[in-house]
Amino acid sequence: MKIKKLLFASALLFSAYNASAHTQVIAHRGFWKTEGSAQNSIAALLKADSIGCYGSEFDVWLAADDQLVVNHDPTFKGKRMENSPSTALTAIKLDNGESLPTLAKYLKAAQPLHTRLILELKAPSTPLRETKAIEKI
């Protein structure tokens, strides 16, 4: 009986150790709670990579002109993501001074990095817009 308990405890300890050995850090909207950074900015992506994050999550909206832009909120600095053209959205300055990025610009900045990207498509207002966004991605 003691041997069974010892084997069970050993297996439990091994599985707990094994699980913790695979835990990875994902930066939510990049590493943005640091100087010179902002949520979903290219700087936040670069900083997530620089500290060795396994991945960096970011949010994508389909703008009114069917271009994809990177931002978390449905409305940002007075502009609704779905109702505004991408040119108006990319003219918005983030809190760190960067322009709100397009998905293409964001992906280009990510190409040389080791951090994996986790794209969250923000819920479009209609199934048709959702399909368009998915096809563009």
Predicted feature residues:
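N-terminal secretory signal peptides that target proteins for export/translocation
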Residues: 1-2
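Sec-dependent N-terminal signal peptides
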Residues: 5-15
